[in-house]
Structure formats: C-alpha cells, structure tokens
Regions:
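Helix-turn-helix DNA-binding elements, focusing on the entry/boundary residues of the two helices
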Residues: 10, 21, 32, 47-50
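Short basic helix-loop element that most often maps to the first helix and adjoining turn
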Residues: 8-25, 79
C-alpha cells in the first residue's frame, strides 16, 4: 500500500469513532475539504496536519501510518541487501 492508505486509515478510524468529517476537521483546525481530500487519497497530509488529525481522533500516528511505514521498511532493507 502507498501513501493513499493514510487517508483510508484516517477515514476508517473516524468512522469507528462515529465522528463526522466536519467535526474532525473542526477539532483538527483544518478545512472539511482538505480532510475529505486526504481521506479520498487526493492529498497527502503535511506532518503538522497529520499530527492534528491523530490528536483529534485520539489515536497514535502509527495506527494511521502502519501500511506506509511497513512498505518503506521493506524497501529500505531490499536496497541495503
């Protein structure tokens, strides 16, 4: 999975916590359009926005980044081999 999984993971946790997209955006201090674009995989959040989102959701960043970090780890080790 690539960077688009960040948005789908954010959406998954938002829905699990029964938070509306508008409420997440407000809590994170972001626009609803920006959060929607992130969730659809159209935009990759900045580090600051990602921190604001995970704090607003009450989750850790690794829960959102698990697919991306795992892929990067495999690529790094294959390049070093």
């Amino acid at each position: 999975m690539g960077l688009e999984s960040i948005g789908s993971n954010i959406r998954k946790f938002r829905l699990m916590k029964k938070i509306r997209q508008e409420d997440l955006a407000e809590k994170a201090g972001l626009s609803t359009n920006y959060v929607g674009a992130i969730e659809r995989g159209e935009k990759v959040p900045s580090l600051e926005a990602l921190i604001d989102i995970v704090n607003a959701l009450g989750i850790s960043a690794d829960m959102v980044l698990c697919d991306v970090v795992h892929t990067g780890y495999e690529v790094r080790h294959s390049l070093l081999a």
